[in-house]
Amino acid sequence: MIYTQHYESPLGGILLAADDTGLTGLWFEGQKYFARTLDAVHQEQETAVLSEARRWLDVYFGGKEPDFTPPLHPAGSAFQQEVWALLRRIPCGQTTTYGALARQLAAERGLSRMSAQAVGGAVGHNVISIIIPCHRVVGTNGSLTGYAGGIDKKAALLRLEMKMTR
Protein backbone atom coordinates (compact mmCIF):
# COMPACT_ATOMS: atom_id res chain seq x y z
CA MET A 1 0.00 0.00 0.00
CA ILE A 2 1.15 3.53 -0.78
CA TYR A 3 0.41 6.27 1.75
CA THR A 4 0.40 9.98 0.98
CA GLN A 5 0.45 13.29 2.79
CA HIS A 6 0.50 16.89 1.72
CA TYR A 7 3.12 19.29 3.03
CA GLU A 8 2.97 23.06 2.70
CA SER A 9 6.45 24.46 2.04
CA PRO A 10 7.53 28.08 1.61
CA LEU A 11 7.78 27.25 -2.13
CA GLY A 12 4.31 25.72 -2.44
CA GLY A 13 2.49 22.48 -1.85
CA ILE A 14 4.35 19.18 -1.85
CA LEU A 15 2.94 15.68 -2.12
CA LEU A 16 4.78 12.97 -0.19
CA ALA A 17 4.30 9.25 -0.88
CA ALA A 18 5.67 6.23 0.97
CA ASP A 19 5.32 2.50 1.26
CA ASP A 20 6.23 0.40 4.29
CA THR A 21 9.93 0.50 3.29
CA GLY A 22 10.53 4.19 2.65
CA LEU A 23 9.68 7.38 0.83
CA THR A 24 8.64 6.64 -2.75
CA GLY A 25 7.89 10.16 -3.96
CA LEU A 26 8.22 13.84 -3.18
CA TRP A 27 6.81 16.22 -5.78
CA PHE A 28 5.97 19.90 -5.90
CA GLU A 29 2.28 20.10 -6.77
CA GLY A 30 1.88 20.63 -10.50
CA GLN A 31 5.50 19.88 -11.38
CA LYS A 32 6.51 18.01 -14.53
CA TYR A 33 6.04 14.24 -14.07
CA PHE A 34 3.90 14.99 -10.98
CA ALA A 35 3.19 11.76 -9.09
CA ARG A 36 3.79 9.64 -12.21
CA THR A 37 4.96 6.68 -10.11
CA LEU A 38 2.13 6.96 -7.60
CA ASP A 39 -0.13 3.90 -7.57
CA ALA A 40 -3.75 4.54 -8.47
CA VAL A 41 -4.67 3.00 -5.12
CA HIS A 42 -3.18 4.99 -2.27
CA GLN A 43 -4.34 6.24 1.08
CA GLU A 44 -3.82 9.62 2.75
CA GLN A 45 -2.47 8.59 6.13
CA GLU A 46 0.33 9.47 8.56
CA THR A 47 3.07 6.84 8.73
CA ALA A 48 6.45 6.75 10.45
CA VAL A 49 8.21 7.25 7.09
CA LEU A 50 6.02 10.22 6.13
CA SER A 51 6.46 11.73 9.59
CA GLU A 52 10.24 11.46 9.22
CA ALA A 53 10.08 13.05 5.75
CA ARG A 54 7.98 15.93 7.09
CA ARG A 55 10.48 16.42 9.92
CA TRP A 56 13.33 16.48 7.35
CA LEU A 57 11.47 19.13 5.34
CA ASP A 58 10.78 21.19 8.49
CA VAL A 59 14.50 21.25 9.31
CA TYR A 60 15.48 21.97 5.69
CA PHE A 61 12.99 24.80 5.11
CA GLY A 62 13.86 26.09 8.58
CA GLY A 63 17.28 26.94 7.12
CA LYS A 64 19.36 24.08 8.49
CA GLU A 65 20.94 21.13 6.71
CA PRO A 66 19.23 18.00 8.09
CA ASP A 67 21.64 15.60 9.79
CA PHE A 68 19.42 12.60 9.01
CA THR A 69 17.66 11.19 5.96
CA PRO A 70 14.29 9.47 6.01
CA PRO A 71 14.28 5.95 4.54
CA LEU A 72 14.10 6.20 0.74
CA HIS A 73 12.55 3.69 -1.66
CA PRO A 74 12.35 5.34 -5.11
CA ALA A 75 11.15 3.24 -8.04
CA GLY A 76 13.36 3.50 -11.11
CA SER A 77 15.61 1.62 -13.48
CA ALA A 78 19.04 0.42 -12.36
CA PHE A 79 20.59 3.31 -14.31
CA GLN A 80 18.29 5.86 -12.66
CA GLN A 81 19.12 4.40 -9.24
CA GLU A 82 22.85 4.83 -9.97
CA VAL A 83 22.37 8.46 -11.01
CA TRP A 84 20.16 9.21 -8.00
CA ALA A 85 22.81 7.72 -5.71
CA LEU A 86 25.34 10.14 -7.25
CA LEU A 87 22.97 13.05 -6.65
CA ARG A 88 22.82 12.20 -2.95
CA ARG A 89 26.60 12.67 -2.76
CA ILE A 90 26.50 16.30 -3.96
CA PRO A 91 27.10 18.35 -0.79
CA CYS A 92 24.51 20.86 0.36
CA GLY A 93 25.34 24.32 -0.96
CA GLN A 94 27.31 22.99 -3.93
CA THR A 95 26.42 22.25 -7.54
CA THR A 96 27.73 20.03 -10.29
CA THR A 97 27.05 19.64 -14.00
CA TYR A 98 25.38 16.90 -16.00
CA GLY A 99 28.72 16.32 -17.74
CA ALA A 100 30.58 15.95 -14.44
CA LEU A 101 27.99 13.42 -13.24
CA ALA A 102 28.36 11.50 -16.52
CA ARG A 103 32.16 11.42 -16.15
CA GLN A 104 31.87 10.30 -12.52
CA LEU A 105 29.44 7.51 -13.37
CA ALA A 106 31.58 6.40 -16.32
CA ALA A 107 34.65 6.23 -14.06
CA GLU A 108 32.76 4.22 -11.44
CA ARG A 109 31.64 1.78 -14.14
CA GLY A 110 35.12 1.56 -15.69
CA LEU A 111 33.96 3.18 -18.94
CA SER A 112 35.78 5.80 -20.97
CA ARG A 113 32.67 7.98 -21.30
CA MET A 114 28.96 8.25 -20.64
CA SER A 115 26.25 10.37 -22.24
CA ALA A 116 25.46 13.54 -20.30
CA GLN A 117 22.01 13.49 -21.95
CA ALA A 118 21.31 10.01 -20.54
CA VAL A 119 22.36 11.20 -17.09
CA GLY A 120 20.21 14.31 -17.55
CA GLY A 121 17.21 12.12 -18.37
CA ALA A 122 17.66 10.18 -15.13
CA VAL A 123 18.14 13.41 -13.16
CA GLY A 124 14.96 14.85 -14.70
CA HIS A 125 12.91 11.81 -13.70
CA ASN A 126 13.98 11.88 -10.04
CA VAL A 127 10.89 10.94 -8.03
CA ILE A 128 12.09 12.28 -4.66
CA SER A 129 12.80 15.98 -5.20
CA ILE A 130 14.86 17.96 -2.69
CA ILE A 131 15.98 14.96 -0.57
CA ILE A 132 17.57 13.43 -3.68
CA PRO A 133 18.98 16.83 -4.69
CA CYS A 134 18.54 17.02 -8.46
CA HIS A 135 18.26 20.81 -8.06
CA ARG A 136 22.05 20.86 -7.45
CA VAL A 137 22.77 19.95 -11.09
CA VAL A 138 23.38 22.89 -13.42
CA GLY A 139 24.35 23.42 -17.04
CA THR A 140 27.98 23.41 -18.19
CA ASN A 141 28.18 27.20 -17.90
CA GLY A 142 26.54 27.20 -14.47
CA SER A 143 23.11 28.12 -15.83
CA LEU A 144 20.01 26.90 -14.02
CA THR A 145 18.69 24.46 -16.59
CA GLY A 146 15.90 21.95 -16.29
CA TYR A 147 14.12 21.32 -13.02
CA ALA A 148 10.80 19.47 -12.97
CA GLY A 149 9.56 21.76 -10.18
CA GLY A 150 10.43 24.88 -12.20
CA ILE A 151 13.54 27.04 -12.46
CA ASP A 152 12.17 29.48 -9.86
CA LYS A 153 12.00 26.70 -7.26
CA LYS A 154 15.46 25.41 -8.25
CA ALA A 155 16.92 28.90 -7.73
CA ALA A 156 15.13 29.27 -4.37
CA LEU A 157 16.41 25.87 -3.14
CA LEU A 158 19.99 26.75 -4.13
CA ARG A 159 19.72 30.15 -2.38
CA LEU A 160 18.39 28.47 0.77
CA GLU A 161 21.27 25.98 0.74
CA MET A 162 23.87 28.73 0.24
CA LYS A 163 22.56 30.37 3.43
CA MET A 164 22.73 27.02 5.28
CA THR A 165 26.39 26.52 4.48
CA ARG A 166 27.68 30.02 5.27
Predicted regions and their residues:
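Nucleic acid-binding interface residues in structured DNA/RNA-binding domains
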Residues: 3-10, 64-166
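Compact structured core domains
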Residues: 18-69
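DNA-contacting interfaces and partner/effector-binding or oligomerization modules
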Residues: 1-24
